[in-house]
């Protein structure tokens, strides 16, 4: 199954606070430089990369001279504000030495729970990745409240992996992976090299609390892997202090714990599209569009749409029917009903002239279409 790692073309890499801050003694720039070298090697090998970086609060604590992690929200937010500056600058300067651009992206739970903001975040991240820029993502600790925080960056990393449809989520931690017993208490504990993410037996061995610098223990990493698995993604939980760990993972070495989904990404997404959203409208397709969608498995372009029915917003589910009313497919639209009315029957290169902007060349992308 390690071919799922070596064959992955889009990685989300999450690095924990303890690994970035030398266990609390400020940012460990030497360690960061080593990871950047490995991520640059991934990039040069044609792998698209997104980095989820913890460490803002921990770096801020060090700068402020705080020994223990505060519990008060306003103190945590103050530490995050101080630490985020240095954290992003450190990543930027280190990647720049290798000629790679980075982009800071701060997210809150609201950004991913609101459909419109979710789509905007997804479009931005996909554009950055396609441009060869490395997005550096963290939770926007300065503005979140207890009610809307992700809780830990493991969860954030899994949601980002789903957002960008990553093939692989790599969670770098201060442990070598998941063990069948607590290695701190049991010298006979064995590393679990591979398991299904939904295996209930993993819950019994994922106990233990987070470190003093972070919020996420092994239980949160297991939950993150299960969240990524819902969209068909694979997860590796692995020790960040293992020498050249990313290089060795890419080469197929059996490091850490590989947690696998129960179905492929495509099957998972199609199942979600088929059964989890309410239909908001209908697009009537001409014969050419019906063939393009159902036989050629292409995206639905505005030029092939004869009529728009119902009221829907960008990102909502619509039914695609032929001119006799027979359902052909369903999918998530890139444009609202009002916008679709203006561009139906028109070629893609006319969208900007008609609307003043372009949210996508297609009305429904083929990745967001499921045939019925």
From Swiss-Prot:
Annotated GO MF terms: ATP binding; glutamate 5-kinase activity; RNA binding
Keywords: Amino-acid biosynthesis, ATP-binding, Cytoplasm, Kinase, Nucleotide-binding, Proline biosynthesis, Transferase
Domain PUA: 280-358
Alphabetical list of Gene3D superfamilies matching this protein: Acetylglutamate kinase-like, PUA domain
Superkingdom of the source species: Bacteria
EC number: 2.7.2.11
A GO cellular component annotation in the UniProt record: cytosol
Alphabetical list of PANTHER family matching this protein: GLUTAMATE 5-KINASE, ISOPENTENYL PHOSPHATE KINASE
Family: Belongs to the glutamate 5-kinase family.
Record's protein name: Glutamate 5-kinase
Species assigned in the record: Pseudomonas paraeruginosa (strain DSM 24068 / PA7) (Pseudomonas aeruginosa (strain PA7))
Lineage: Bacteria, Pseudomonadati, Pseudomonadota, Gammaproteobacteria, Pseudomonadales
């Amino acid at each position: 199954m390690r071919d799922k790692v070596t064959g992955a073309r889009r990685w989300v890499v999450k690095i924990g606070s303890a690994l970035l801050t030398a266990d609390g003694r400020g940012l460990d720039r030497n360690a960061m430089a080593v990871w950047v070298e490995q991520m640059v090697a991934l990039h040069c090998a044609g792998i698209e990369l997104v980095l989820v970086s913890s460490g803002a609060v921990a770096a801020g604590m060090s700068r402020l001279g705080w020994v223990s992690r505060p519990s008060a929200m306003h103190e945590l937010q103050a530490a995050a504000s101080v630490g985020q500056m240095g954290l992003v600058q450190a990543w930027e300067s280190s990647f720049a030495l290798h000629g790679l651009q980075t982009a800071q992206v701060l997210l809150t739970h609201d950004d991913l729970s609101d459909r419109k903001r979710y789509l905007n975040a997804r479009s931005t991240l996909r554009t950055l990745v396609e441009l060869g820029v490395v997005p550096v993502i963290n939770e926007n600790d300065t503005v979140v409240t207890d009610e809307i925080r992700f809780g830990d960056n493991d969860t954030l990393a899994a949601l980002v992996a789903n957002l960008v449809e990553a093939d692989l989520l790599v969670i770098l931690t201060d442990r070598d992976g998941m063990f069948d017993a607590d290695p701190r208490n049991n010298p006979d504990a064995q590393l679990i090299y591979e398991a299904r993410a939904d295996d209930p037996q993993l819950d019994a061995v994922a106990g233990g609390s987070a470190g003093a610098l972070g919020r996420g223990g092994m239980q949160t990493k297991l939950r993150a892997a299960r969240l990524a698995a819902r969209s068909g993604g694979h997860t590796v939980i692995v020790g960040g202090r293992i020498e050249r760990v990313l290089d060795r993972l890419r080469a197929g070495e059996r490091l850490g714990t590989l947690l696998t989904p129960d179905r492929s990404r495509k099957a998972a997404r199609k199942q979600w599209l088929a059964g989890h959203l309410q239909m908001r409208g209908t697009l009537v397709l001409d014969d050419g569009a019906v063939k393009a969608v159902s036989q050629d498995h292409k995206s639905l372009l505005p030029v092939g749409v004869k009529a728009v029915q119902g009221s829907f917003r960008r990102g909502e589910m619509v039914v695609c029917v032929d001119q006799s009313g027979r359902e052909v497919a369903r999918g998530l639209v890139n444009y609202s009903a009002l916008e679709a009315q203006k561009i139906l029957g028109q070629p893609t290169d006319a969208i900007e002239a008609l609307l003043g902007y372009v949210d996508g060349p297609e009305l429904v992308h083929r990745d967001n279409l499921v045939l019925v």
